[in-house]
Amino acid sequence: QVRLLLPGEVLRFDLSQERPRLCQRQRLATAPASEEDSLDEQLGETLERCRQTFRPCALLVSGGVDSNLLGSYLDPQLQRFHLCLEGDEESLLPHPRLQRFELRQEAFMPLLRRAVGNFGGATRMSSLLMYQRLADGIGEQGYHCVLLGEGADELFWGYPRHLELWRRRDAPEPRRFAAAWFGEYRRKAALLAEPAGRRVAERIEELAHEALGQGLEAAIGQFDLHYSLEPLLRRADHLLMSRTIEARTPYLHGALAQRAGRLQRIVGDTAKAPLVALLEQREKRWQAQPKRHFRLPFERWPQALGEMRRHLAERLPALHDLGLEGLDAPSVAALPGDQLFTLTTLSLWQQEYGASL
């Protein structure tokens, strides 16, 4: 029997016998964060709790705000890991214990097949491949616990869509709101046989309309949770756990979500303003950089694009069987990298799990 633990629930086991025995179930009352506690103090306390483990712990770092802010609280001797993409390297703050893992185009298809198998589904997140490479590298170094900056962009509004929606202040019509998360979803849905394609687009707009009925801020929170944060966490969990690595997410603990909602998250043209201000205060070497999305640089990876086009061209009959009747050789030759990736993961998923379908 599988029973989910509630937040704040503690189980105590007697390990003196051959088989562990549950001897106490306790629910800890968590006091709400004091308004007197600064964001600095609250994040530091949350990070300290997330670090509590008997295993060596490391931090995944990029050149962005979230991981660098976490790193400003940590011992300089704590291991840092970073993923370098061929043709798209990122500038990082110097650190004595920084190890880089490289991801090259030549590894694309074999690694993607493994990543799709571990993830267990099709996805548009090209970072799937990046997390598989990170998991392999971290696992080879013997680490089984890593700290991630996931959740900061959703809670503190760090994406370009947040700036765009907040500048207008008025609730947009459902199509424009949905496009902020799903892009040109009607064009993409046109690859499906009718009436499925039309129904998909209509359902997306129904969900956007229902969310906007709660107000713009609540709608953003709802779509961020279900269509951004949850998929990203599932990606991190499945790919890292393929190498028995636990992912810990300090920004999602310690009532930081409630505090984020009470702060002015966008100031002028600065997204994620409270975190940016805190990082500038704590890390004097930090210099603001344009937002970089954690995704593959398909515009610089022609070899990967070619591999996906060849794979899809060979798999057209199987994809037609899945309902993608609008997909043909000319469209495969013209599709952009992000859509090629989504369709390739669908094809690989069908190959990996076809016997069970």
Task: State each model region's role.
Residues 2, 9, 14-19, 36-58, ...:
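Peripheral terminal appendages
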Residues 52-54, 138-143:
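Glycine-rich phosphate-binding loop signature in dinucleotide/nucleotide-binding domains
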Residues 86-138, 156-170, 213-215, 262-266:
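ATP-dependent adenylate-handling ligase core
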Residues 121-125, 167, 211-224, 269-270, ...:
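Structural motif
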Residues 143-171, 215-324:
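Mid-to-C-terminal catalytic subdomains of enzymes
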Residues 164-184:
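Conserved phosphoryl-transfer catalytic core
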